[in-house]
Amino acid sequence: HQGVVALFDEDDGRLLCLMNAGPITARRTAAVSALSVALLARQDSRILAILGAGIQARAHLEAVAPTRGFSEIWLGARHPGPAQSMAERDPRCHLSPSFEAAVTMADVVVCCTDADSPVVAHQWLRPGCHVVSVGSGAELDADTVAGSK
């Protein structure tokens, strides 16, 4: 996705700056996701799964990981190189062999993919799992969406 953020002078409306919207959007989106985890996820949530390894996934690792006392963070990604770079940011991070493996052990699942088909199946989710989906509309299967509260 491409975008820009324009900053204008509040007094006279002059354009002060044009910025790449990617990093700003990633941080804003991750902040809202972190708020949802802080307010809605079970208090005893200890295992976080992040699916994806792009700019949104990196921002979500930074924003969501501090919201709970996560003892483990599992990273699921189609491309292991970027996921490995993410894992090096936090000693709690582990690379998962699959999306399913990451999801089945998680109390909180954050989906940040551009998948064109589901990467989360309802039957993989533990009871009470909090799911955040910020990527494509296809990340979650229909049963996960229908079963959400």
Model region roles, listed by residue range:
Residues L125-C129, V134-K149:
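Rossmann-fold NAD(P)-binding glycine/threonine-rich loop
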Residues G52-G54:
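Glycine-rich Rossmann-fold phosphate-binding loop(s) that bind the pyrophosphate
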Residues A57-R58:
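N-terminal Rossmann-fold NAD(P) dinucleotide-binding loop
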Residues L40-I47, G69, R126-P127:
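Short helix-loop-beta connector
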Residues P66-D90:
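NAD(P)-binding Rossmann-fold cofactor-contacting core
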Residues P91-A106, H122:
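Short acidic low-complexity segments
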Residues T113-A115, G135-S136:
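Short glycine-/small-residue-rich Rossmann-like dinucleotide-binding loops
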Residues H1-S45:
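Phosphate/diphosphate ligand-binding glycine-rich loop within oxidoreductases
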